[in-house]
Amino acid sequence: MNISGQTTFSEAQSKSLLKQFGVVFADETEVTADADSIDKAVKAAEQIGFPVVIKLCGESISHKTERGLVRLGIDNAATAAVAARDLLAKASSDDGRVSLLVAKMESGKRELIAGIMRDPQFGLFVMLGLGGILTEVIADVAFAPVPLSKTGALAMQNRLQQKKLFGEFRGESAVSSEQLANLLVALSRAAENDPSISSIDINPVLIREDGSIVAVDALVVKDSQRSGTSVTQRTKEMQSTNSNIRLFETLFNPRGVVVVGASTHPGKFGFVSLHNLISCGYQGQIFATHLELASVLGVKSVASIDDLPADEIDMAFVCTPASTNIAILEACSRKNIRSVYITSAGYGEAGEAGIQAQQFLMDKARELDILLLGPNGQGLVSTPANLCAQIVGPYPPKGRISVASQSGNFVSSFMNYARFTNVGIARAISAGNAACTGVPEVLDFFAADDATAVALVYIEGIQDGEKLAASMKSITKVKPLVVVKGGSTSSGALAAASHTGALASNDRVFDGVCFANGVTRVASAEEAFDVAATFATQPLPKGPNVVVLTTVGGWGVVTSDVISNDSVLNLIELPTDLSDAISALLPDRWSHNNPVDCAGGETRDTIPEVMRLIAIHPSVDSLIFLGLGIQSNQARLMTEGPFYPEHGLERIVSYHQRQDERFAQVAAELSIQTDKPILVATELGVADVKNPGVMAVQESGRLCYANGQRAARALALTYQYAKWCGIAK
């Protein structure tokens, strides 16, 4: 069937194509529709062996079950003849040429769906999910981009929510993960071999009683208008992107900055940006333009860029109306200003005229070989250069997290978290409308940037999925990438004949892209910062084994629950030698298991000594410590009461505070000594940031987690990345 350039293959044609790549189907025979069809169908059934299935097949027939075009469990010749006759009678003129498919009756209590779909942004994907007639209702699926490796195919099986169905099930053997992986790789090879394929459906894939798998239905759709991938064009685009990386140095480490459109009014962008630039300690040369030559915050302005010295300014921060910005780009080029950040609105976000104006701006920037950021953005921060070129606060402490965002608000949010936690930022930039330079290009720079240890990104719309995926893949090879994505929507109209297409969505496909490329995707800004801060301040775990050390029993329980339910980390049973060593330091009432609950039996040195025993043990890969700050919390209450500093309170307050400070310091020191992550969590990290224990964690350069669950989740995600890149076992 050919509709609007799309060719839908019949089931028989689809199976014939896929068999070439190793897809295993049930034994079957195709019987053409003619005067002898019924007799031929009966003979085919007898040769295959009863019981059999008989289906009506045609190029225009997709959902056979819904139309009643399948007869199951046929166990004798007479029944086969009746079924063949009834099915042929159901054929309509819209079905085109039809035939009968006579196949061995396969059975299995578990059904899967596998296939190929083409996403308009990211290209071809392999799909695996729970199959059968409730496929769309259950919608438990995973996607992975083509090409798919054997390793990737095995990993897909663990991404389904109901993956326990792959194990032993109601007297049946566990599924052959090897056979299932081979099926997925075969689908990938078929799609790679023929770029015109737009979708493949295999539904169901039956899991037999012995765990082997067999495909019993197939549907292939091709798009004759698709000539193949534009590899040459994509290569040229990547080369162009890579050539811009050197220009980012002029943006994030400029020798000089000019604020174009400076203002004397404290409510205007031209004032705020100049104020932030000066106040945050930028040491390069600062210039400003002002039509009336006003002196703004001690900076004597000039009338235009043409009045500035040449080859001394690397970046222009533009706060002028959109109508003036083409001329400003030309003036910047004359003065060899190579990077320009435009805050002005009135472009792509402002209707048809704005879209046209943005296109003119893009064309001019490319013509002049200027790195253009924005328009309609809030600015950038580069703490290694003490640079705060933005129209809003805050300015974060120095650190190793670098932020890129399609939303300026998220840039501010992440920097606010940095100020609150004292886990600092290296670079941060709002992409604005991303006319010429968006998140992919910024990621390419972060990948090569020595100041960046981890990239933290917020994404909404995706302009070029393949470019974004390539940038993600590039950076995760050398450093972690944490992503929050908003704006999950339907992936648009896909072929109604395809179950695979119906199950796809932007969000599921994006999950597949992230998983395949080692990207750490999270749901919220809070979790994103937790994870990025963990990457930036802790060693990567070398394995899954974690121990929870707690002086607060309840928090140990709920943290352990998160670890167990997440099924990423392993809450190990304490080795006998470790348990015995801990018993020598604690009263007999301690928990004697993991979590290690000290049960109130601590002396002055107990926590540091127990923490050390756990951290240095070869069976332990990471440690979470709960209960910091409790002593200092009591100390605070003592200082606020009417009896302080009498009755020995001054001495005990000092002791309590020193103990919490010591615990935090020991955690940091042991982490460095053992090269293992040791995470410290307490609600006081939010409830009382001036608690000496919390402050000591911050002074050590590490994150004080708001609770054990958040620490456990962050640790699990860092372990997954470490495992993906081959660091962890």
Regions found by a protein language model. Name each.
Residues 1-729:
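Catalytic-core regions of core metabolic enzymes
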